């Protein structure tokens, strides 16, 4: 146990070192912000995964969200009949169908979040969380609000919360907005992961830990050395009534679901094509099982080991994490699913499952770069060159944040097991 815990600490130190190496201005790093963000990220991990009361609260929250998702299945079942799961979560007659089980729930959840915005419930949470981050970290109001918003909405939608302030924000603040978007996932997408069978408590914990984690590494890699914007409140689209809010949310969710479905169709097919070509090449080289997963697993095995995964399981973990970074997190979670079932190809420890789940829980992948540039660039055109230049660094920050959350999760789950 002691060795495992120490290795988790070493993994954290390596992540900090990587960020420091890529820092654009090491002298400008505000260590008060860095230490405070790290303490908050660790504290959230401890509360959710180690402290008994916190674990009970997380389980209760997860059960509540799962119940809300089950109500969404009523709408899905109305459209698709017995093909859809029932309110208890029992699969339809066709078994698990991604478009029915997952994409339809994204639409329902997006509509629910839109309603919560209209009722002023979501802005209240964003203001509270964003205000707390601002006071604890010393970050600007605008970037703190954006970080809080990213817990609930996608990285293309969160900047809309602070849209009136984007033009006056410094380069470091814009970069922070990019980074927290890459480190987080949207509420509707999180519901989609849960509908796939990914453990919801881990997803919720990872989502909340992404806010301080994204700011932590953003302020190491691109420190603040300009005047920051001091005032920003949540700016939301005004709806006429609750019906319009629900309808607009459904439209937004439909666009998101179509995007996710199209991306998966393309990327899963492309993955199969790449593996087929590698299989042909491998046949000539006497390596019949050559695949992209095998290559990524071999290359990233040391990284997975550094995150706290046993060496015997690190190859599988490296493969899944690599596919997530190269393609997207949905494909990564689809690769993880067989190891969460009753007859896994390889038995993974609960700690390993948790570390992989946390490491995948973010939009930090190469396929998100175009969405980031197009979405944020359209809101603040004069900063588009900056956004393009820093997009890959934002993916790096998001990845480091997810890895830090994964390492923290592995530490506390390991301690809890003993």
UniProtKB/Swiss-Prot annotation:
Q: Which domain of life is it from?
A: Bacteria
Q: What is its main location?
A: membrane
Keywords in UniProt for this one? Cell inner membrane, Cell membrane, Membrane, Transmembrane, Transmembrane helix
Question: Its GO CC terms?
Answer: plasma membrane
Record's function text = Involved in purine nucleosides uptake. Could also be involved in uptake of nucleobases.
NCBIfam families, sorted: nupC
| Protein's UniProt name | Nucleoside permease NupC
């Amino acid at each position: 146990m002691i060795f495992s815990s120490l290795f988790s600490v070493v993994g954290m130190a390596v992540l900090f070192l990587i960020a420091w190496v890529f820092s654009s201005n090491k002298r400008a790093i505000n260590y008060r912000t860095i230490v405070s963000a790290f303490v908050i990220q660790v504290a959230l991990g401890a509360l959710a995964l180690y402290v008994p009361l916190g674990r009970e609260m997380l389980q209760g929250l997860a059960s509540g969200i799962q119940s809300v998702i089950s109500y969404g299945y009523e709408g899905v079942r109305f459209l698709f009949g017995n093909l859809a799961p029932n309110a208890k979560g029992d699969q339809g007659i066709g078994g698990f169908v991604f478009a029915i089980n997952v994409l339809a729930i994204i639409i329902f959840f997006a509509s629910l979040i839109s309603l919560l915005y209209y009722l002023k419930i979501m802005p209240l949470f964003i203001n509270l969380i964003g205000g707390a981050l601002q006071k604890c970290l010393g970050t600007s109001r605008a970037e703190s609000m954006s970080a809080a918003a990213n817990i609930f909405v996608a990285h293309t939608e969160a900047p809309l919360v602070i849209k009136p302030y984007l033009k006056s924000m410094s380069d470091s603040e814009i970069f922070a907005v990019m980074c927290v978007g890459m480190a987080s996932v949207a509420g509707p997408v999180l519901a989609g992961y849960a509908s796939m069978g990914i453990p919801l408590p881990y997803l919720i914990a990872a989502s909340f830990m992404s806010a301080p984690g994204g700011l932590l590494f953003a302020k190491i890699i691109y420190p603040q050395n300009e005047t920051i914007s001091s005032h920003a409140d949540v700016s939301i689209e005004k709806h006429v009534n609750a019906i319009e809010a629900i309808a607009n949310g459904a439209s937004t969710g439909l666009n998101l679901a179509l995007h996710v479905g199209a991306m998966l169709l393309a990327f899963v097919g492309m993955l199969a094509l790449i593996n087929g070509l590698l299989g042909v090449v491998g046949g000539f080289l006497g390596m019949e099982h050559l695949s992209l997963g095998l290559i990524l697993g071999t290359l990233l095995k040391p990284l997975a080991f550094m995150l706290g995964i046993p060496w015997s399981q690190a190859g599988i973990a490296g493969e899944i994490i690599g596919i997530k970074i190269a393609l997207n997190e949905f494909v990564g979670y689809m690769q993880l699913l067989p190891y969460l079932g009753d007859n896994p190809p390889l038995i993974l420890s609960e700690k390993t499952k948790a570390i992989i789940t946390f490491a995948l829980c973010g939009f930090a992948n190469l396929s998100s770069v175009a969405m980031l540039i197009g979405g944020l660039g359209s809101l603040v055109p004069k900063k588009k060159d900056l956004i393009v230049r820093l997009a890959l660094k934002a993916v790096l920050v998001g990845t480091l944040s997810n890895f830090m959350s994964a390492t923290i999760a592995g530490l506390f789950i390991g301690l809890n097991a003993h």
